[in-house]
């Protein structure tokens, strides 16, 4: 795969989270091959993005050991996700991508809820850099006008506050 000119690898770790495995089982079952996969990417100058919507909080210290590049798709409304703890624990070592709920906020929420969610995510995750504002998972812009409106609202709020004017 890497010989084909890949620049970036995204691993969907949804079924590797503590929603299914204890941290000790995660270390036993996944750590070794994940570390090999990440190191292989880095030797080829390929960045590595690890997605995990929920169940990541008990694994944050292990994430620092794995040394992947981006932790993404985390959702603040799922499984006790703590944005401040994520930033404090892994935000110096890993780029962070996510922080806004896709379904309840972007697909079903009001513009006020979107604004509050964006400001909360940026306030908790952007300090010191290394943060990419994004939904916790995919959104479907063709679903209805609410989703489209809220997607553009997320971007507009980010543009208003991106230079530290929260």
Give the location of each predicted region:
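Active-site loop segments of alpha/beta catalytic cores
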Residues: 1-166
């Amino acid at each position: 795969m890497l010989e084909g000119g890949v620049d970036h690898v995204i691993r969907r770790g949804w079924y590797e989270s503590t929603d299914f495995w204890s941290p000790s089982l995660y270390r036993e079952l996944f750590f070794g091959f994940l570390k090999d996969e990440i190191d292989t990417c880095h030797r080829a100058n390929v960045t590595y993005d690890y997605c995990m919507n929920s169940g990541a909080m008990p694994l944050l210290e292990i994430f620092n050991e794995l040394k992947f590049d981006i932790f993404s798709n985390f959702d603040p409304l799922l499984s006790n996700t703590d944005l401040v703890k994520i930033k404090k624990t892994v935000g110096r070592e890993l780029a962070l991508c996510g922080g806004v709920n896709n379904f309840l906020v972007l697909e079903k929420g009001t513009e006020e809820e979107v604004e509050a969610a964006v400001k909360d995510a940026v306030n908790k995750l952007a300090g010191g850099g290394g943060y990419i504002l994004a939904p916790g998972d995919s959104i479907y812009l063709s679903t209805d006008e609410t989703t489209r409106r809220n997607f553009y609202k997320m971007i507009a709020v980010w543009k208003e506050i991106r230079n530290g004017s929260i």
